Amino acid sequence: DRDSCVDKSQCAKYGYYYQCDECCKKAGDRAGTCEYFKCKCNP
């Protein structure tokens, strides 16, 4: 789910990150980006 995207993320500090995007889409959101080492989903 969406929380697992954020909780498991240890991603690049800035910008688009593929795994966040994929995980967020599976959780039902449009896309995901990485901000300050955490995934952020876009509803």
Swiss-Prot record:
GO terms for cellular component: extracellular region. It is found in: Secreted. Gene3D superfamilies: Knottin, scorpion toxin-like. Transmembrane segments: none annotated. GO terms for molecular function: potassium channel inhibitor activity; toxin activity. Expressed by the venom gland. The keyword Acyltransferase does not apply. The keyword Secreted applies. InterPro entries: Ergtoxin, Scorpion_toxin-like_sf. The presence of a 'disulfide through disulfide knot' structurally defines this protein as a knottin. Reversibly blocks Kv11/ERG potassium channels. This is Potassium channel toxin gamma-KTx 4.5. It comes from Centruroides exilicauda.
